[in-house]
Regions:
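Bacterial N-terminal signal peptides that target proteins for export
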Residues: 1-9
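Bacterial N-terminal signal peptides
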Residues: 8-18
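Sec/Tat signal peptide C-region and signal peptidase I cleavage site
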Residues: 19-23
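Conserved hydrophobic positions within beta-strands
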Residues: 39-43
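Short aromatic-glycine-enriched beta-strand elements
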Residues: 49-60
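Short, structured beta-strand/loop micro-motifs enriched in basic residues and often containing a Trp
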Residues: 72-81
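Short nucleic-acid-contacting surface segments enriched for D/E, G, S/T with interspersed K/R
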Residues: 80-97
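OB-fold/S1-family single-stranded nucleic acid-binding modules
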Residues: 102-126
């Protein structure tokens, strides 16, 4: 009986851990595929942290004032495999980011592609399944 109870408790614990991990990586939990964005601005900061990287860019608003957007990207390891280096996004670099805005309407988004001022384009490492179909 005790072994059976231990097995059930372990199974429930494993199920809860799996559900948490899945929810963490669910695009639809945070971002809206019906809110595609294109924002152009200057890099303020690039955080190469796990499990996701963050690019902070200043985008000029309609009133001419800078608004900081936080763009989520793949893990540093994935970005390096896609052609990024630690020197790819120094502060001041002008970029265009395509992605999807947060469901709460904040200036936060998941990025799909970055285009540099010279026309070079890099993929931010999130699959089509994560960022919406056909985007």
């Amino acid at each position: 009986m005790r072994t059976r109870l231990l097995a059930v408790v372990a199974g429930v614990g494993l199920l809860l851990a799996t559900t948490s991990a899945w929810a963490h990586h669910a695009f639809a939990a945070e971002f809206d595929q019906n809110k595609p964005i294109k924002v152009r601005g200057a890099v303020v900061k690039w955080e190469l942290t796990n499990p996701h990287s963050w690019i902070h860019i200043d985008v000029k608003g309609d009133d001419g004032k800078a608004v900081t957007w936080m763009i989520e990207g793949a893990s540093p390891n994935n970005l390096y495999r896609l052609g990024f280096t630690k020197e790819s996004l120094p502060p001041g670099t002008e970029i265009l980011v395509e992605g999807y805005q947060a469901k709460d309407g904040s200036t936060r988004a998941v990025g799909r592609n970055i285009t540099f001022s010279d026309g070079k384009k890099l993929f931010l490492g999130l699959s089509e399944a994560e960022t919406g179909p056909g985007k």
